Amino acid sequence: MRTYRYFLLLFWVGQPYPTFSNPLSKRTSGFPAKRKALELSANSRNELSRSKRSWMWNQFFLLEEYTGSDYQYVGKLHSDQDRGDGSLKYILSGDGAGDLFIINENTGDIQATKRLDREEKPVYILRAQAVNRRTGRPVEPESEFIIKIHDINDNEPIFTKDVYTATVPEMADVGTFVVQVTATDADDPTYGNSAKVVYSILQGQPYFSVESETGIIKTALLNMDRENREQYQVVIQAKDMGGQMGGLSGTTTVNITLTDVNDNPPRFPQSTYQFKTPESSPPGTPIGRIKASDADVGENAEIEYSITDGEGHEMFDVITDQETQEGIITVKKLLDFEKKKVYTLKVEASNPHVEPRFLYLGPFKDSATVRIVVDDVDEPPVFSKLAYILQIREDARINTTIGSVAAQDPDAARNPVKYSVDRHTDMDRIFNIDSGNGSIFTSKLLDRETLLWHNITVIATEINNPKQSSRVPLYIKVLDVNDNAPEFAEFYETFVCEKAKADQLIQTLRAVDKDDPYSGHQFSFSLAPEAASSSNFTIQDNKDNTAGILTRKNGYNRHEMSTYLLPVVISDNDYPVQSSTGTVTVRVCACDHHGNMQSCHAEALIHPTGLSTGALVAILLCIVILLVTVVLFAALRRQRKKEPLIISKEDIRDNIVSYNDEGGGEEDTQAFDIGTLRNPEAMEDSKSRRDIVPEALFLPRRTPTARDNTDVRDFINQRLKENDTDPTAPPYDSLATYAYEGTGSVADSLSSLESVTTDGDQDYDYLSDWGPRFKKLADMYGGMDSDKDS
């Protein structure tokens, strides 16, 4: 027979609280329908009576915040298989098992080891099982039970905000909603009154009130004025336990600000204002400021100013400064001291935003009187017009009067005025003006085709006060006269085919005219009288300012006459009639059967501008030949500068070179007259010149004496003489040194020559022996003795 096992669940309730138990619904699995009955009892152990049961008692209750020194007893587990011999062991698992909750494995007693807080965790779910201590096998199925934590009033109400901020319009009705405050209590709202909160006001009466259940704050006093008091601080208390004695409470502060409404009209601090302004003030000039005060703020304090009455509302205006809320009096039109000296205005200040419910307080506007005094100033002359427009024919003579301008001093003194033309606007001085009466006249001839409009400026200046002057623009239009003859619109050059037929159109002519007649241009075309009878062409006037050139005969011969020049007379229809003669060039050309030109003397008519292929080839060949010539010339010159390959051992030559001499370069050091080296007389003279006193004494440099070769010497001297006397010989064929004046030169230094006026006994005849290079010097100085004798 199968053994049924049961748990005995016992709940012990500590004093002074009673024992609670809740039935569990019937189990549907794991156990037969018939069960042994369990009976729960308090601290005393009552007899267990067996009875058929259908509910299990598996729920325990435990109070939170236990403050005793011992563990808090929860309940007891017991199995029918427990004979009390210690063979069974009770095991507890689940939420807090072994930590918060412990079980006596021998007796099944459950205890709580710590203080429990329902607000942290209200329910704990655990599982219990009885097992054989020796085998470890369960003797009862695992059973689940619940431990619920019962609430106590251990949490005070807490507001959602520490400080509330709210606003309400001033002058609000009683009961106007301000703000709602909310407090929450962490205690269990389903158990007792621990979480039932009631609101009350501790500070803020009699201005505000609060609803006890909802926490809604409302106004409680009528006509609260922001201008008297703007800020209010209200303290609200929230208390649990329904507000009963012993309940916990919390407070919060509500800062309430009265917002402004337009309940105050603007007011001027004074009833009359007075300002001064000179009559020369231009429109828009500020004269003065007025300000009305308004006790309101924001847009309710905005003020609009306007001129409602007075004799100067057309001359002055008032605008509102949005930053300072001041009214700025400005000039609207030009003032004239001579016409009116004092103006009186009525200025009104009003609120643009008015609430109808406060209209009973009176009109939301105020007015003040403004008196404006106009001061006299010395004003510049005033022209009778803002601008003048005059006309004149382009054929007008010099000093022709065009018109006049007029200006006068607006002041009471009526100072005289003189006129002048601003020459910056009339640089060519085409016009002039009479300084006394303002008459405008021409000073040069006009040409409409050059300039149609002349824009000048006339200046009017007070004679007694030249600083006072004014200007006016003067526009002068030059009227057209028919002074230009019509002419061809372009240069006409055309051709006619040799096989052309009579009356064939070969060119259409057009004309232009610089004049601008009112009725439009109407030109007529005709051949000049001298060509009309003998011409091979005729002119056909199309009556639309165009004409056509027609052939007059059949066939033309370009070999007999290649070009025809047709003089065409163009006339206009204006008065006086103007005409001009233009020439049309007609060339006779050979054409194909379609009339297209093939060849004629005027090649430019058919060939495009540019070069043919043959011309380009010829140019390229010329360039190549030129380059070859230059290269050969350079190579030949370099070859001549090279030293000879074989130098005779008998030919010993030395050069004295000064490297810091800024002479002519390579030519100065290499080109010398070799003939002087082969002239013993010249060499002897260079050794003993008695006619010249040297500035410094230099020892002559001795060179080895070369073997005298008469044939070579005569041959070289002959060739040198031929080249020296040949004026067409190129310069690089003669080797000579003219600028070098160093020691050792066979010609000595020219710096030792003295003036003829200081030493008349000098003999310069030896210059003739130095060759043709010194012939000029020999002519100048060699014959001086004979000149003196004569």
UniProtKB/Swiss-Prot annotation:
Annotated GO CC locations: glutamatergic synapse; nucleoplasm; plasma membrane; synapse
Membrane-related topology note: Single-pass type I membrane protein
SUPFAM superfamilies assigned: Cadherin-like (SSF49313)
Position of the signal peptide: 1-18
Annotated coiled-coil segments of the chain: none
Cytoplasmic compartment spans: 637-790
Proregion span(s): 19-53
Every Cadherin domain range: 54-159, 160-268, 269-383, 384-486, 487-608
Pfam family of the protein (one): CADH_Y-type_LIR
GO biological process: homophilic cell adhesion via plasma membrane adhesion molecules; Notch signaling pathway; synaptic membrane adhesion
Highest taxon in the source lineage: Eukaryota
Molecular function (Gene Ontology), one example: calcium ion binding
Topological domain ranges for the Extracellular compartment: 54-615
Location(s) in or outside the cell: Cell membrane
Modified residues (Phosphoserine): 786, 790
Residue spans crossing the bilayer: 616-636
Biased segments, Polar residues type: 269-279
Keywords: Calcium, Cell adhesion, Cell membrane, Cleavage on pair of basic residues, Glycoprotein, Membrane, Metal-binding, Phosphoprotein, Repeat, Signal, Transmembrane, Transmembrane helix
Protein purpose: Cadherins are calcium-dependent cell adhesion proteins. They preferentially interact with themselves in a homophilic manner in connecting cells; cadherins may thus contribute to the sorting of heterogeneous cell types.
Entry note about domains: Three calcium ions are usually bound at the interface of each cadherin domain and rigidify the connections, imparting a strong curvature to the full-length ectodomain.
Listed PANTHER family: CADHERIN-23 (PTHR24027), CADHERIN-6 (PTHR24027:SF322)
Record's protein name: Cadherin-6
